[in-house]
Swiss-Prot record:
Residues 65-87 are annotated as: Mitochondrial targeting sequence. One of its GO terms (biological process) is symbiont-mediated perturbation of host apoptosis. Residues 1-29 have a biased composition (Polar residues). Residues 1-31 are annotated as: Disordered. Oligomer. Interacts with human SLC25A6/ANT3 and VDAC1. Interacts with host MAVS. InterPro entries: Flu_proapoptotic_PB1-F2. One of its GO terms (cellular component) is host cell mitochondrial inner membrane. The gene is PB1. This is Protein PB1-F2. The keyword Ligase does not apply. The record marks N66 as: Low pathogenicity. Signal peptide: none annotated.
C-alpha cells in the first residue's frame, strides 16, 4: 500500500492526537489546525500564483514587442474569432 506524502496542507489540517484507553484500544481525536501553518501555506501558494502570472504577462509583452510569425498568426486568429463572435453589429 502506498503511503500518502506529508504536505504542509495535510500536516496543518490533519493533526491527530492518539490517546490510549485503559483497554489498549486507540482513539483518534482531530485537533485544531495550526492557523499559522495554514496562513504560511496559503501565502506560499498565492506567491507561486503571482510569480506565474508575472511570467505569463512578461512572455506576452515580449511576444508583442518581438513578434514571431507564429505569434502574429495566433493573435490575428484570436482577434478574428472574437470579431466573428460579436458579429457585424455596430
Amino acid at each position: 500500500m502506498e503511503q500518502e506524502q506529508d504536505t504542509p496542507w495535510t500536516q496543518s489540517t490533519e493533526h491527530i492526537n492518539i490517546q490510549k484507553k485503559g483497554s489498549g484500544q486507540q482513539t483518534q481525536k482531530l485537533g485544531r489546525p495550526n492557523l499559522t501553518r495554514l496562513m504560511d501555506h496559503y501565502l506560499r501558494i498565492m506567491s507561486q500564483v503571482d510569480m506565474h502570472k508575472q511570467t505569463v504577462s512578461w512572455k506576452l509583452w515580449l511576444s508583442l514587442r518581438n513578434p514571431t510569425q507564429g505569434s502574429l498568426r495566433t493573435r490575428a486568429l484570436k482577434q478574428w474569432k472574437s470579431f466573428n463572435k460579436q458579429g457585424w453589429t455596430n
